[in-house]
Amino acid sequence: MRTFAIEEKERIESIIRQSAVCHVGITDPEGNPYVIPMNFGYEDGIIYLHSGPEGGKLEMLERNNRVCITFSRGHELVYQHPKVACSYSMRSESAMCRGRVTFIEDMEEKRRILDIIMHHYTDNEFGYSEPALRNVKVWKVPVERMTGKVFGLRGHEKP
């Protein structure tokens, strides 16, 4: 099975838009990786996330705001021969984005971003109470670098 880079930005953005969750990689105080599955929204080259107002991940981001965020879609088990274990692979597409987190404090901007996140999952309209807005941490990650890959293609298949 073969792996190919995805060059087209539109296709990479399609992977992002069709993913249900993302995985956010940050660095803990000892320099170790720390990866969190999160809900998200994406618009105009910016990934939006939200979390509780305090906790370990926020402390880590205060020390180092660089993140790596991954997305994937279309997971399908494929093989070349059903009795040969090494011929099995997982066909899928992935996107990886790098950027720096900033936290949004403005209440109207929080509302707008929370709508972007919610519209990733549903077309419903929502309202947000002032206490809810005060107690949510809204993350903004402008994408600095975006790459994509397709995995598990047979020799004759094109990416």
Ranges and model annotations:
Residues 26-28, 71-73, 143-145:
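Short, structured patches in soluble enzyme cores that scaffold and shape functional sites
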Residues 19-53, 69:
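Short beta-strand segments
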Residues 1-18, 159:
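Extreme N-terminal tail/first-helix region
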Residues 57-81, 86-88:
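Helix-adjacent hinge/juxtasegments
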Residues 45-46, 65, 144-146:
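Beta-strand-connecting loop/turn residues
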Residues 17, 62-67, 115, 119-123:
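Short, intrinsically disordered, mixed-charge
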Residues 2-3, 76-159:
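Charged, gly/pro-rich active-site loop segments
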